[in-house]
Amino acid sequence: MIKNLSNMKNDNQKREKCCEYIEALEEERRKINVFQRELPLCVELVTQAIEAYKREISGTSTDNLYGQSECSEQTTGECGRILDLFIPIKHSSTSIEEEVDDKDDDDEEHQSHETDIDFDDKNMKSEWLKSVQLWNQSDAVVSNNRQDRSQEKTETLVELIKINDEAAKKNNNIKSPVTTSDGGSGGGGGRRGQRKNRRCWSQELHRRFLNALKQLGGPHVATPKQIRDIMKVDGLTNDEVKSHLQKYRLHARRPSQTTPNNRNSQTQHFVVVGGIWVPQTNHSTANAVNAVASGETTGIYGPMVSSLPSEWPRHSNFGRKISEDRSRCSNNGFFRCSSPAMSCSTRTKTKDAKIIS
């Protein structure tokens, strides 16, 4: 920047530029003075730049003065030579004294300026030394602060551990029963006490639930949110409606799934009577009575009695056994058979034969 100023020919422009630079640097120095201890070298560089610009301004002013004096000396010298030829000129004592006084003033100003510079340098050195001492002290302070913080952390951790132990002891000592909506009670700590009680679905609430399902088209079409909006019950949540809807769907599926299983579970029981396989009628009638008493239906038709087997088991001695029974019972006038079905049929036949005879 100083080289650029030296290249400028106009002295007024040089002064204006130097003044602008000096003002800007002074503002920067004011900002840096806040951090003078941390940035001593920056302050020193800025002050040196300000002094350099001031010297540049003083140099331009002295050049102007020297130029004017040289011109005046040249003019006076030429005039003096001309006048010396005609009139002897004598220097007055007052002019000499004034020149001496001016020189003395210039010397004093120069000395005062040098003393100011020396004083500023000494101040900067002292401040720099102070900042170095502060830096050395700051390391020790930082280490002390770290130790203090570590001690505080350990103390706080110990206090927190004590508080947690006391709270755990209190929770173990306190046992409060928590009653639920189902009527059961159980001992528990604070966690069970904070749990939300299950909703008890009353008949009125279930009736509203069924009406909502009818309006929406059935349990497989309706959604929990739609059901809750139609029911309009305070405090009823979507989760509660969802759980109740799932239970209702399972309950609706049970009859259609259990009835065919019950049919298949009714096994056919047979009894061997006189070498003949005969179904056990008591078992079938008992099953029919139990089915009627229990009220199990298929959903469309009423209770049904298990049917007789379509095919009877075959036996090799079936014809021979019947002939033997006929020969034994021919004397009495009717057939006697060990099986109840055959005995009934033979008795009816003999009675009809007697009536005809």
Curated annotation (Swiss-Prot):
Cited InterPro entries: Homeodomain-like_sf, HRS1-like, Myb_dom, Myb_dom_plants, SANT/Myb
GO terms (BP aspect): cellular response to phosphate starvation; regulation of DNA-templated transcription; response to nitrate starvation
Domain of life according to the entry: Eukaryota
Entry keywords, A to Z: DNA-binding, Nucleus, Transcription, Transcription regulation
Domain (HTH myb-type) ranges: 193-253
GO molecular function: DNA binding; DNA-binding transcription factor activity
Compositional bias ranges of the Acidic residues kind: 96-109
Pfam families for the chain: Myb_DNA-binding
Disulfide bonds: none
UniProt keyword annotation of DNA-binding present: yes
The entry's DNA-binding region: 224-249
Compositionally biased spans, kind Polar residues: 171-182
Name used for this protein in its record: Transcription factor HHO1
The organism of origin for this protein: Arabidopsis thaliana (Mouse-ear cress)
